[in-house]
From Swiss-Prot:
Subunit description: Part of the 50S ribosomal subunit. Forms a bridge to the 30S subunit in the 70S ribosome.
GO molecular function: rRNA binding; structural constituent of ribosome; transferase activity
Protein name listed in UniProt: Large ribosomal subunit protein uL2
Family statement: Belongs to the universal ribosomal protein uL2 family.
General function of this protein: One of the primary rRNA binding proteins. Required for association of the 30S and 50S subunits to form the 70S ribosome, for tRNA binding and peptide bond formation. It has been suggested to have peptidyltransferase activity; this is somewhat controversial. Makes several contacts with the 16S rRNA in the 70S ribosome.
Length: 282
């Protein structure tokens, strides 16, 4: 993986960097037609047209690639035929050709190459791209696309450069302990499946977007501070010049306390499976 730097020919180019796709991707062709569906841009609106997620809108038109997060094709070998760009995520994807003729997209893991064979099996080899249940994976192994519920599909560690580490297994064999990239340590059912290795494109977080326009191409709109709004737009707004917010503590646009307020529901069932919270990682 390599980062491409640009000369300062314009203000927008100064300090701008991108991922060198030519060093990783194998094709500039269109994606597999059978695994592509249309995608309507919601621009952060719900079915009533009301904004439910701010700072979204615009951006380039995209088509959605159907990714196999379940990896439920058991004991059938597949060969990596291409490594492709996916506009819907910061990780790359691989096209897998299975011996029975079926094709599926999976997440690209660090170390994958065209021609490699991968398999999802109860006793799969501990090799990058293979899938196995957590109970059969040795301690210390780095994993991604980890299930939280057996058969539901991977939900943990799916973004670029992310991974979790298997720390240990319970004596009764029901749960295994994982350390997430956030520092959180939690238990997961040993029957859940996970993919061996780390997600690729690990240098994505080093990209300098260079100018606001590149974020607009991605569908990200500006984030405006409440203190520079009018009073009818935000509780922090109004006043002459740079006025203080006029409250004991900062609040959200809807008047609820912000910054430092715990928002997690302590009655969640998964609360008892969290051994160490990410806030206590030190």
């Amino acid at each position: 993986m390599a980062i491409k730097k640009y000369k300062s020919t314009t203000n927008g180019r100064r300090n701008m960097t991108t991922i060198d796709y030519s060093a990783v991707l194998t094709t500039k062709n269109n994606p597999e037609k059978s695994l592509v569906v249309s995608k309507n841009s919601k621009a952060g609106r719900n079915n009533r047209g009301l904004i439910t997620t701010r700072h979204k809108g615009g951006g380039h038109k995209q088509k959605y690639r159907i990714i196999d997060f379940k990896r439920n094709k058991r004991d059938i070998f597949g060969t990596i035929s291409t490594i492709e760009y996916d506009p819907n995520r910061n990780a790359f994807i691989c096209l897998i050709n299975y011996v029975d003729g079926e094709k599926r997209y999976i997440l690209f893991a660090k170390g994958m190459q065209v021609g490699m064979k991968v398999v999802a099996s109860e006793n799969a080899d501990i090799k990058v791209g293979n899938v196995a249940p957590l109970k059969n994976i040795p301690e210390g192994t780095l994993l991604h696309n980890v299930e939280l519920k057996p058969g539901k599909g991977g939900q943990i560690a799916r973004s670029a450069g992310s991974s979790v580490q298997l720390l240990g297994k319970d004596d009764d064999g029901k749960y295994v302990t994982l350390r997430l990239s956030s520092g959180e340590v939690r238990k997961v059912l040993a029957e859940c499946y996970a993919t061996i290795g780390e997600v690729g494109n690990e240098e994505y977080n080093l990209v300098n977007w260079g100018k606001a326009g590149r974020n607009r191409w991605r569908g990200i709109r500006p984030t405006v501070r409440g203190s520079v709004m009018n009073p009818n737009d935000h509780p922090h707004g109004g006043g002459e010049g740079r006025a203080p917010i006029g409250r004991k503590s900062p609040v959200t646009p809807w008047g609820k306390k912000a910054l430092g307020v715990k928002t997690r529901n302590t009655k969640k069932t998964s609360e008892k499976l969290i051994v160490r919270k990410r806030s206590n990682k030190k």
